């Protein structure tokens, strides 16, 4: 590898896939890449791969891929059998949104909530802002005012 890898997607477990697709689209502007699919253990290549990934307890899940502005996607999972993922999940996803306060307000107004009481500067006296929220399903979303590279470049 000659440089850092590109982030391609973040997997997020939700309890209602259809609602999550609408929520991530309406609130944050993500767009479905294709239709939602159902994957069953032992059903075709996808079922074989999923059974290998999730182990013998896996039965089936529903899945959707949502496109973001910079090519990084969100991969939504609704585990049906068993009804939730039995492994530890991600801590958070981070989205560069520009107007952190406005997006945090939209999240809180549509079934999510703010975890931090305010929008914080990441560094004192600099324009890079952050706020932690939760989506309508309890997953942590960190909001950035700028890209990760711009925020963290040239730090000692």
Give the predicted meaning of each segment.
Residues 1-3, 7-15, 35, 60-75, 79-108, 129-134, ...:
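Vicinal oxygen chelate
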Residues 2, 54-56, 65-66, 84-85, ...:
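Short secondary-structure boundary/capping segments
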Residues 13-70, 102:
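Core segments of cupin and vicinal oxygen chelate
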Residues 19, 78, 145:
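Short, glycine/acidic-enriched loop or turn micro-motifs at the edges of active sites
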Residues 31, 73, 113:
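Residue-level detector of anion-binding/catalytic polar loops
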Residues 40, 81, 147-150:
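A short acidic/small-residue loop/turn micro-motif
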Residues 48-51, 79, 114-118:
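Short secondary-structure boundary micro-motifs
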